[in-house]
Structure formats: C-alpha cells, structure tokens
From Swiss-Prot:
Top class in the EC scheme: transferase
Protein name as catalogued: Beta-1,4 N-acetylgalactosaminyltransferase 1
Annotated InterPro entries: Glyco_trans_2-like (IPR001173), GM2_synthase (IPR011143), Nucleotide-diphossugar_trans (IPR029044)
Entry-listed glycosylation sites: N79, N179, N274
Positions on the Cytoplasmic side per record topology: 1-7
Pathological association: Spastic paraplegia 26, autosomal recessive: A form of spastic paraplegia, a neurodegenerative disorder characterized by a slow, gradual, progressive weakness and spasticity of the lower limbs. Rate of progression and the severity of symptoms are quite variable. Initial symptoms may include difficulty with balance, weakness and stiffness in the legs, muscle spasms, and dragging the toes when walking. In some forms of the disorder, bladder symptoms (such as incontinence) may appear, or the weakness and stiffness may spread to other parts of the body.
Alphabetically ordered keywords of this record: Disease variant, Disulfide bond, Glycoprotein, Glycosyltransferase, Golgi apparatus, Hereditary spastic paraplegia, Lipid metabolism, Membrane, Neurodegeneration, Signal-anchor, Sphingolipid metabolism, Transferase, Transmembrane, Transmembrane helix
Cysteines engaged in disulfide bonds, as pairs: C429-C476
Organism annotation: Homo sapiens
Length: 533
C-alpha cells in the first residue's frame, strides 16, 4: 500500500515536470507566442511628432542641440493610445496589459455625434473651471519693478492693500512714474504722500508720478485694489509698468474656504480616540441578509456603540434593527453607487468607514489605526486589507493616470498596481490612487467626490477616478477585515437568493451594463480608451 502511494506520487510529479517542460519549450520556440513580458510600461504609441516647445526662438535657431530621447519620452505628446500586451500564452505571474476601446460602445454615426457633443461640453467645462490664475506668466529679466508673485487674494466686491509694490530704479532721475492696470477691479490709495501725483484713483488705471523715489515707494505701500465684478472664484491679471518695463501678476478673487468641523467627542478612559464619535460604518446590501447580520454581529464585538448605516435596494426587504443601526430602503435594484450615496448622506461623523455587507470584523480590524492616519496626515482616505478564506489579503493598491490624446479624440486612462511612496511615520502604509473596498475617509471629501448613480451594478475604481487630483489616498496593510467565504459546498441546498444576487452583481462582458459604463466613461471623463494591468 505504501509503495503504491509512493509510485502514484512519483507519477504525478513526473507528469507535472513534463507538462512544465513542454510549456517552456512551446513558449520558447513557437513563433506565434511571446516571451514573458517585462514590467509594465505604457503602450508604445505611433511615432511621435516634434514637440513645438522644443523649437528654438529664431535668434537661437543656429545653435545645435543634442536631444535626449530618454527625457523627451517622458514629456506629454497629446497623442495617446491603448494597446493590450496581446498574443502569447498567459503564464503565472506574467504581467498582462488589458486594453478597452471605449469608442466600441458606439456605432460610427453615434460616435461622431457623441464626440461632437462631448467636445462642446468640454469647452464649456474649461470656461467654468479655468481662471486667469491658471495662465502662464513669465517674469521679465532684470526688471526694476518689485511686485508679489503669488498669494494676493481678495473677496468678491471687497478691498485689500496690495503688498510688495516697489520701484528699484537708479537714483538721479528727474521724475519717477509707475502705472497699474486692472480688468476686474479698481485702484486707489489708503493715504496720500506729499510730493506724489495720482491720476485715476477709483478707476482701472492708476498712474503715480513723483520726483522723489522714496516718496513714490512709500505711496506704493498704500495702494489698494477693490474687486468690482462679483465672481466667486476667479483672478485678475493686473499690469505693473514703468518706462521700458512691464510686469504682470494675479490677484485671486474668491471667498475663503469655509471650514466644516466635527467635535471629537469625549475620550473614553485610556483611549486615544473616541471611535463612536468619530466614525460611522456604512454599507450597501442587496438580498444577503445573513451576511449583513453576521457583519453587524462582528462589529458589535469590537465597537458596540458605533453607528452602522445600511442602504438596501432588495426586492423584498427584511427588517434590520438594533441599537445604533440605521436601515434605509431604496427602490428595487436602484444600484450600487446610488446606495453608497444614500448611506454616506446620512453620516453625521467626521469619518465614514465603507465596508461590503459580507465582511467580518476581527481583532485585526483596528479602526483606531486608520483614524490615527487621517488625524495626523493630510490624507482624505485610507484603505485597509481584505482577507479571503484562503488567508490571502489584498489591499488592491492602484495607480491611476490620464494621458492627453490628440484633439477631439479624448484621453487615455492608465491603471496599474502599485503605490507612489511610503507614508512617513506609518510603517505598512503607502500613498496611492485607489484602494480596496474597505476604507476610512473624511465624510465631506467622500460627499464632494460622490458616487455616480449611473453606475448601478459593477463599479468601484470609478469613484477614485472621479476623485483623481482632489482625493488624497493612502493604504495600510496591517488593518485587516475578513471576507466571508463565497465557496458553495456541493451538499448544501440551492440558494435562489444567491443566484439572483450573482445575476445582478456579476454581469457578463457583453452585458448592457458594461456597455453603458464604457459609454459613460467615454463622455463623462473625455476618454477614448483605458488600459489595466
């Protein structure tokens, strides 16, 4: 019997080695298959045109330059495209790049109309979101004018003293003169200096003339700017000039950011934070009431007084109640992101912890650790890790970037695994762009980004794409929540609810919800395609 088992094991091992040998030989010699890929890199685009920014000024055209291709390749070329790694037999641990052409969600005539409408909406967006403060200003060389480079700000229809104005001219001139010109406001002075002549007080153009340089500079210290056009967030590019020299700087016009502060609550004895006063746990459920109740039970073992908010769009909702539990019902199948919006809208604490309804809290689900990260860093959101029944835990750290495309075509979204850098002072934590579906976030920032309710069945990373550039994201691998097992044992009874859930939660690649998502990304984010690792 023992020899028979040993012979069987040897046979299995021999077959496995032979299979691996054949696989290696086929991938090594077959002309139609590729070698394992190198670490992920953006797909190669067609030959790039010359960058206009590298063209010399006419007076320097005769000077030879050796272009550094490695550096030039890092610059934006505004002609991105998306390509899969393609071909080959996928091998374990081999990095593959998957590309999605979002334009394939449209027929040709519809694509032309959608592209034209999208471009029109994009130009309207630029006109709303950009201001003169975004314009490039280049300071002139060796100017005698002293002026503020940045940091001058005024509220709409209010006045300020303009700091830092001065003329550093050579002494001995008969007369000194400077001019100030504005477009959205007017100039005046808070006091008049003897020996200085003013022209244009209370107007958009102000001239100051004096035979004495010191008197002129003292007068410049008293110059005021008044906003005359009610715009809540813009900038006035003003001109400051003297004979033979002119400079420009911006005065930002806006209301100061209004804070939204939350009381931290009294600290329990020996505790660093009052988690019940700082954190609300939010989840979205659909049909899986057994899993939801298991989640709540596990939460109560460690956080008995933390509020749990539930958004529910089940067909036949069951009552879920208890201390510190809020259960909100929605129309049947309203959707994944719509449920997130509803749950987050009811949060009254500084932070919201998002969890799936089939998670299970353990001793390693330490919310204090996540709160500490947000309290002591500028991050807006920090994710943890989700542990599967196999013991494997994932943080799903994702890097997102958008590359500019050719005019009218849209941009390219790049998604790959990884992080930007470690978070100083917090071992096991990093800074990234997207995390797993278990995260603690500042409630106001989550509401600011929001969850697009048009994404009803399959969505997650789209939230981080909406927040790219405004949402500061981190991830800590040492805060872990368990994921309830999805394994179905063959001897268990058929679960109609689980089958219904699976139909809604896991649509096929050709399902209409997937096509609708591609059309949404094409228009909403002005994308033509996307690649993922």
């Amino acid at each position: 019997m023992w020899l028979g088992r040993r012979a069987l094991c040897a046979l299995v091992l021999l077959l496995a080695c032979a299979s691996l040998g054949l696989l290696y030989a086929s991938t090594r010699d077959a002309p139609g298959l590729r070698l394992p890929l190198a670490p992920w890199a953006p797909p190669q685009s067609p030959r790039r045109p010359e960058l206009p920014d590298l063209a010399p000024e006419p007076r320097y055209a005769h000077i030879p330059v050796r272009i550094k291709e490695q550096v030039v390749g890092l610059l934006a070329w505004n002609n991105c495209s998306c390509e899969s790694s393609g071909g080959g037999l996928p091998l374990p641990f081999q990095k593959q790049v998957r590309a999605i052409d979002l334009t394939k969600a449209f027929d040709p005539a519809e694509l032309r109309a959608a592209s034209a409408t999208r471009e029109q909406e994009f130009q309207a967006f630029l006109s709303r979101s950009q201001s003169p403060a975004d314009q490039l200003l280049i300071a002139p060389a060796n100017s005698p004018l002293q002026y503020p480079l940045q940091g001058v700000e005024v509220q709409p229809l209010r006045s300020i003293l303009v700091p830092g104005l001065s003329l550093q001219a050579a002494s001995g001139q008969e007369v000194y003169q400077v001019n100030l010109t504005a477009s959205l406001g007017t100039w005046d002075v808070a006091g008049e200096v003897t020996g200085v002549t003013l022209t244009g007080e209370g107007q958009a153009d102000l001239t100051l003339v004096s035979p004495g340089l010191d008197q002129l500079n003292r007068q410049l210290q008293l110059v005021t700017y008044s906003s005359r056009s009610y715009q809540t967030n813009t900038a006035d590019t003003v001109r400051f000039s003297t004979e033979g020299h002119e400079a420009a700087f911006t005065i930002r016009i806006r209301h100061p950011p209004n804070p939204r502060l939350y009381p931290p609550g009294s600290l329990p004895q020996g505790a660093q934070y009052n988690i019940s006063a700082l954190v609300t746990i939010a989840t979205k459920t659909f049909l899986r009431y057994d899993r939801l109740r298991a989640l709540i039970t596990s939460i109560r073992r460690f956080y008995p007084t933390v509020t749990v908010v539930i958004a529910d769009d089940s067909d036949k909702p069951e009552r879920v109640s208890g201390p510190y539990v809020e259960h909100y019902l929605m129309p049947f199948g309203k959707g994944w992101f719509a449920g997130r919006n509803l749950a987050v809208s009811q949060v009254t604490t500084k932070y919201v912890l998002w969890v799936d309804d089939d998670f299970v809290f353990t001793a390693r689900t330490r919310l204090e650790r996540l709160v500490d990260v947000l309290e002591r860093t500028p991050l807006d959101l920090v994710g943890g890790a989700v542990r599967e029944i196999s013991g494997f835990a994932t943080t799903y750290r994702q890097l997102l970037s958008v590359e500019p495309g050719a005019p009218g075509l849209g941009n390219c979204l790049r998604q790959r695994r990884g992080f930007h850098h470690e978070l100083v002072g917090f071992p096991g934590c990093v800074v990234t762009d997207g995390v797993v579906n278990f995260f603690l976030a500042r409630t106001d920032k989550v509401r600011e980004v929001g969850f697009d309710p048009r994404l009803s069945r399959v969505a997650h990373l789209e939230f981080f794409l909406d927040g790219l550039g405004s949402l500061r994201v981190g991830s800590c691998s040492d805060v872990v929540v368990d994921h309830a097992s999805k394994l179905k044992l063959p001897w268990t009874s058929r679960d109609a609810g689980a089958e219904t859930y699976a139909r809604y939660r896991y649509p096929g690649s050709l399902d209409e919800s997937q096509m609708a998502k591609h059309r949404l990304l094409f228009f909403k984010h002005r994308l033509q395609c996307m690649t993922s690792q």
